[in-house]
Structures are given as structure tokens and as C-alpha cells.
């Protein structure tokens, strides 16, 4: 979700804040983020803001591979966010095309509730993660973004 339209970002942050607050109200204290640019890092910032008033909250960074962690640590802002995490999990040492799927699978397997920002596309990492969340029978909180892309079979018929 690095390519989000600017006008959607504030709406997404508001919706993420709402879902985080709802999770805290429901008793959740541990949150995970894959630390991708964009939505993942907005989520991190919002959880860490809430940690200031709710010290029991924990954030775990789930990083797909070692060089990604190295590149995050080179930027002051993301290094500070990582340092504020209770734990940093690196899924595998070397990059392989499947690293992001493995990271997402790890987060779903270790979660009771998944919060997903989703544009409705049937392909891609978010769609795959949502399908896996359903298969694992985990609770899913979906935040729609942008123009929702409808699959062809759901589009209105035009004459």
C-alpha cells in the first residue's frame, strides 16, 4: 500500500486508529506489523502513540528478511520505531520471492484478530493474506480503501 492516494491516507489513519482502539477495548495488548512502507508504518505509529497512555501494549515487528531489517535501520525514523518494539522477528535470513507470504502467514498464525487495509483486488499479498485469515478462521477487520475493485462476476451488467 505504498501507492495510496494522498486523500485516502487520513481516512486510513482514522480507521486504523478506530480498529486499534476497538482491539484495546476488547482486551488485545499485543500488536504485530510487517513494517512495509505506508499502511504498516502508520499502524506502528498509532500503536506506539497509544502505548504512551497504555503501557501494557506491545508491538512486534515482523520483518521478512535480514537485509530489509538492515535497510529499515538505516533510516532514523524507522530505526526509532523498531527500537520501540517489544520484539523484532526476522522470518528468514535471505530474500526469496516467497518471503512476504511467509511474513504474512506468520502474522496471521500468531494473531487472533487481523486488521487489513484492502482495495478489493483479487490478486496480491493483501488478498492472499485475507484468504489465509479466513482459512485459519481468524477474526478479520477490513478497512476498505480507494475505489474498490469489483471482480468481473460482481460488476453490474451493461447493455
What is the predicted function of each stretch?
Residues 1-157:
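Acidic/glycine-enriched connector segments
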Amino acid at each position: 500500500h505504498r501507492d495510496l492516494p494522498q486523500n485516502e491516507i487520513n481516512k486510513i489513519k482514522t480507521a486504523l486508529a478506530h480498529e486499534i482502539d476497538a482491539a484495546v477495548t476488547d482486551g488485545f495488548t499485543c500488536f504485530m506489523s510487517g513494517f512495509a512502507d505506508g499502511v504498516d508504518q502508520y499502524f506502528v505509529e498509532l500503536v506506539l502513540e497509544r502505548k504512551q497512555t497504555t503501557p501494557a501494549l506491545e508491538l512486534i515487528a515482523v520483518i521478512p528478511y535480514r537485509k530489509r531489517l538492515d535497510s529499515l535501520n538505516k533510516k532514523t525514523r524507522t530505526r526509532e520505531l523498531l527500537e520501540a518494539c517489544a520484539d523484532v522477528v526476522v522470518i528468514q535470513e535471505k530474500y526469496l520471492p516467497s518471503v512476504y507470504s511467509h511474513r504474512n502467514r506468520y502474522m496471521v498464525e500468531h494473531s487472533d484478530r487481523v486488521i487489513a487495509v484492502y482495495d478489493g483486488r483479487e490478486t496480491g499479498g493483501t488478498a492472499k493474506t485475507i484468504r489465509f485469515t479466513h482459512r485459519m478462521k481468524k477474526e478479520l477487520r477490513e478497512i476498505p480503501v480507494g475505489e474498490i475493485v469489483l471482480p468481473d462476476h460482481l460488476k453490474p451488467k451493461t447493455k
